[in-house]
Structures are given as structure tokens and as C-alpha cells.
Amino acid sequence: MVDIDFMEIQLKLYGSSKLLSDKETLLIELPENSNIEQLRNSLSKIISDKYSKSNLGNLPKSAAFFSENNEVINDNYQLKNKELISIIPPIGGG
């Protein structure tokens, strides 16, 4: 049997993503050495499991993610345990 080590990521919520928690951040547990793509997948599962009746379904695919240094990060960005990552949903308007 293989033991999988996990890490915790703090996801700082902005805009419509604030509907996911009554706090400023959401704690997400991921396997060690996960990247942003895996964070998106985990967030999609959380939304489908807990918020299936909301309109947040496209949030993980369409949102931008930012590092602690406020740099836009892509899906290959390697996450670190206890890292603070910000999620910025798309903003519409006209």
C-alpha cells in the first residue's frame, strides 16, 4: 500500500469565489507536489459536491490564480505546502 503525503493550500477568495466560504480563505488539501491544474480539479469537485445548485460551476476553469507575490500563475505552477494562492474570478460588465 502506498502512502500519499498531502499538503494544505490556503485559497484567498475574491469576487464570486467568496460564496465558497464565510471566511476570506478556503483551506484545500491536495497531494504533495500538486500544481494549479490539480487545484482547479479539486475546486471543481468541491463545487459540484457542495454547491451544485449555484452558478459557480465554471469558476475553476475561468478564474485566474495569483501567487503570494501577486504574479499570475499558470496551470503548471508547482504549489508548496501552506502556500497562499489567490483566486480571481472573471469580471463582467459593459
Residue ranges of predicted features:
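Ubiquitin-like/PB1-type beta-grasp interaction modules and other compact soluble beta-rich domains
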Residues: 2-93
